[in-house]
Amino acid sequence: MPNFEPNTISELEINISQCTKCDLAKTRNLTVPGDGNYNANIMLIGEAPGSNEDKTGKPFAGRAGSLLDELLMRSGIERSKVYITNMLKCRPPSNRDPQSSEISACQPYLDLQISLVDPSVIVTLGRFSFAKFFPQVTLSESRGIVRDWKGIKILPVYHPAAALYNPSLKPKLIQDFQKITTLLAEKDNTSLSNIQTQPNTQLNLFE
């Protein structure tokens, strides 16, 4: 990453496209920074790009992406209204699991994406993205359970690709995705309640 910190997602995506911080830079075709609404209330974080993503430069461009689109649609959410990214910005060879060194190399990029998008809800897709926020617990015991992380609601769900290999997981994904709109409504109601009940409270920008 350059010496200066990007101020926008667009600047950050340019930096990612030039990244050579790990060996994945030697085998990738395209970097896959992220895609969607830069001011989204909902951010989805997957694990790593696959072969389709490596060719297009867009996250969730293959079969898992088609299922993700269906899950969002069933929940009344337009894909264009969310921001989607991955833990890794380059495809691992043969679609293997991300390595810890690769996750560490990409972590500053993801941290900046979260900071710049500033979502109300983050949906973690799969165990690697969930472990970024709560490494002490497993996805299997936490799936669908909303947790708070620095004021952001974290909703852990199975990766859509898992449901392609194990169709019995799809109903659970559908159920979990339907919680997103409820979370946003709760967030809006809380904000409205705070305005109504604390009209004289000043926001401390340094908290």
Positions of predicted regions on the chain:
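Glycine/proline-rich loop-helix segments at beta-alpha junctions forming the active-site rim
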Residues: P2, S10, S17, S75, ...
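Short, mixed-charge, low-aromatic patches
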Residues: C22-N29, G62-L68, F130-L139
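A sequence-composition feature that detects small, non-aromatic residues
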Residues: A25, A40, A48, A61-A64, ...
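Short acidic-hydrophobic sequence patches enriched in Asp/Glu that either
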Residues: T8, F60-L67, E102, K172
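Active-site and ligand/interface coordination hotspots across diverse enzymes
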Residues: M1-R63, Q196-E207
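Short N-terminal helix-initiation segments at or just after the protein's N-terminus
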Residues: N29-V32, S66-L68, Q99-S104
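Glycine-rich, small/polar surface segments that engage phosphate groups of diverse ligands
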Residues: N52-Y83
